[in-house]
Amino acid sequence: MTKWLLLVVCLGIACQDVTSAAVNHQRKSANNLAHSMKVIYEWKHIDFDFGSDERRDAAIKSGEFDHTKNYPFDVDRWRDKTFVTIERNNGVPSSLNVVTNKKGKGGPLLRPYPDWSFAKYEDCSGIVSAFKIAVDKFDRLWVLDSGLVNNNQPMCSPKLLTFDLKTSKLVKQVEIPHNIAVNATTGMGELVSLAVQAIDRTNTMVYIADEKGEGLIMYQNSDDSFHRLTSNTFDYDPRYTKLTVAGESFTVKNGIYGIALSPVTNNLYYSPLLSHGLYYVDTEQFSNPQYEENNVQYEGSQDILNTQSFGKVVSKNGVLFLGLVGNSGIACVNEHQVLQRESFDVVAQNEETLQMIVSMKIMENLPQSGRINDPEGNEYMLALSNRMQKIINNDFNFNDVNFRILGANVDDLMRNTRCGRYHNQNAGNQNADNQNADNQNANNQNADNQNANKQNGNRQNDNRQNDNKQNGNRQNDNKQNGNRQNDNKQNGNRQNGNKQNDNKQNGNRQNDNKRNGNRQNDNQNNQNDNNRNDNQVHHSSKLH
């Protein structure tokens, strides 16, 4: 009896230890999500570098500047310049700005870009309301000026402006025709997002989202032509007109908002703000001058998310990131996977710092606030959180931090997620840290090298018929396909034993991607990853 009691007690202790370990593991996962994005800039309220205290005081007295009316909506970066846009209201002295290294009481001071002359808008010659911006690969800054002021009242025609970032000179300005900028049926229009597809300097397509008119506008810079598309996938879903962020709710009726262009597939991803859906259109359809609007194919799913999504961006290897509204976080999905709920993961989640991610941008080799350079070729994400629920409800506490620009290395964000595994597979990244956390002692960095494992001294040249000099074992020379089945007895490393079928990274991986030789543990057609670690299960459950 005593022995049985001891056994029960011991089993109870063991189970308690296992349960405790599981809880601690989940806590660590939540902690990682909360700190995935690092704060780069933050503001209690927005202020400007007016050049002098006298100039600032005069702006306040005249009503030109009111710190309670300045709300940021977009961010982008080029070299050492971080751009921030502010929707134009009374009290907003400049809509397009750069962050300076000067500090004010509310946070870093902003300076108009390119200078104060463009901040004057009364005669419509300057920048009225630069809602969204984009930097392209030719060092050009594209600015979408909605022409709206004071809660979206029309003042000037909407327009596209293009700046040469190397000289800060305006190189082009094009007005968007009225019949393109508004819905012909409802007469409504509010241009809120853009995505730039720069094939070359004279062949660039710009896509613009009209959230109020529920349309998608296309601009071709070669001939300054505009086209407007309509689709029911642009319309808001009446089931989801109520948004709740950090316990605070508001109601709006907005259609298509966040859009993002994939550099891999040329798919344009989008969703209405008031929707749980995610859609895309293959922009290759528009390269045919004879395309017909009625024949444009739109793909996607109506209820693939469990919350509304805002800002969007796609990495160079086809990973789409979305700002989640109700979850106060960022999700990802790899476009090489089937577009379904099970394909998503959460890469960041923080109820305080990630409230309303209205903008996300990805760039390479970003100096973080001019201080740190990422390794060559790495991608870096910037995200803007602006607590839009408080903008709508007009209940800011300007003693709190309200606006943040956050950043993270893209590979770090995706580590231990489904997106990371597929991302590294397509990038040819040999970092097995994203593939199998249990294999800590294996030499995985060269696992994708099909013809050589020089670190082990075992050269596998397909065309050699008799040569296996490194291990002196000539038992089975398979001369036709160069697949030498040598045990590699010198180092006991069997990673290179079978070129056709073996997963070379550890010898213990269960997912043999035999057809394409891509040994990164994921068969893209098999969504049930047998080696998914606890972090991944924890992430994916948040979207269900």
Swiss-Prot record:
- Its job: Abundant protein component of royal jelly, a substance produced in the hypopharyngeal gland containing proteins, free amino acids, fatty acids, sugars and other nutrients, which is fed to developing larvae by worker nurse bees. Major royal jelly proteins (MRJPs) are high in essential amino acids and probably have a nutritional function in larval food. All larvae are fed some royal jelly (also known as worker jelly) early in their development but it forms the principal source of nutrition for larvae destined to become queen bees.
**Chain segments carrying region Disordered:** 421-544
Q: How does it assemble?
A: Homoligomer; in the absence of RNA, assembles into a higher-order oligomeric form, composed of around 20 monomer units.
The UniProt entry, under InterPro entries, shows: 6-blade_b-propeller_TolB-like, Royal_jelly/protein_yellow
- Please state the gene responsible for encoding this protein: Mrjp3
Q: Outline the inducing conditions.
A: Significantly down-regulated by the ecdysteroid 20-hydroxyecdysone (ecdysterone or 20E).
- Taxonomic lineage of the native organism: Eukaryota, Metazoa, Ecdysozoa, Arthropoda, Hexapoda
- Tell me which residues are glycosylated: N183
Identification of the protein by name: Major royal jelly protein 3
Q: Where is this region: 23 X 5 AA tandem repeats of [NKR]-[RQ]-N-[AGD]-[DNG]?
A: 424-523
PANTHER family in the record, alphabetically? Answer: GH10609P-RELATED, PROTEIN YELLOW-RELATED
The entry's description of pH dependence is: Optimum pH for protein stability is 4.5. Protein becomes unstable at pH above 10.0.
Q: Which organism is it from?
A: Apis mellifera (Honeybee)
Q: In which tissues is it expressed?
A: Found in and secreted from the hypopharyngeal glands of the worker honey bee (at protein level); expression peaks at 12 days post eclosion. Expressed in the brains of worker bees. Expressed in the brains of adult worker bees peaking at 12 days post eclosion (at protein level). Expressed in the spermatheca of adult queen bees (at protein level); Expression levels are higher in mated queens than in virgin queens. Expressed in queen bee ovaries and male drone testes. Expression in the head of forager worker bees is lower than in the heads of nurse worker bees.
Q: Which domain of life is it from?
A: Eukaryota
Q: Which GO terms describe its cellular component?
A: extracellular region
Q: Where in the cell is it found?
A: Secreted
